Amino acid sequence: MSKDDLIQFTGTVLELLPNANFRVKLENDHLIIAHTSGRMRKNRIRILLGDKVTVEMTPYDLTKGRVIHRH
């Protein structure tokens, strides 16, 4: 799968879960579970409750995603 196949959405962090996972509400009112991308972990970017984030998702599983940017 190439980067072109991934879908990006904007959402808000609703809940902090263990192991750097988050419950995110997308702009289209869907709830997903998202984890922090490796680059955000490496640079120690903190994600807090209520933060606006950009989530990258695969078209095969629309219930999970990866947080790639914090606004």
Swiss-Prot record:
Residues annotated as domain S1-like: 1-71
Alphabetic keyword roster: Cytoplasm, Initiation factor, Protein biosynthesis, RNA-binding, rRNA-binding
Pfam families referenced in this protein's UniProt entry, alphabetically: eIF-1a
Annotated Gene3D superfamilies: Nucleic acid-binding proteins
Any one of the GO CC terms: cytosol
Coiled coil region boundaries: none
Location, primary (coarse class): cytoplasm
Subcellular location: Cytoplasm
Presence of keyword Ribosomal protein: no
The keyword Cytoplasm appears for this protein: yes
Molecular functions per Gene Ontology: ribosome binding; rRNA binding; translation initiation factor activity
SUPFAM superfamilies in the cross-refs: Nucleic acid-binding proteins
Known partners and oligomeric status: Component of the 30S ribosomal translation pre-initiation complex which assembles on the 30S ribosome in the order IF-2 and IF-3, IF-1 and N-formylmethionyl-tRNA(fMet); mRNA recruitment can occur at any time during PIC assembly.
Similarity field: Belongs to the IF-1 family.
Function description: One of the essential components for the initiation of protein synthesis. Stabilizes the binding of IF-2 and IF-3 on the 30S subunit to which N-formylmethionyl-tRNA(fMet) subsequently binds. Helps modulate mRNA selection, yielding the 30S pre-initiation complex (PIC). Upon addition of the 50S ribosomal subunit IF-1, IF-2 and IF-3 are released leaving the mature 70S translation initiation complex.
Name this protein carries in UniProt: Translation initiation factor IF-1
Designated gene of the protein: infA
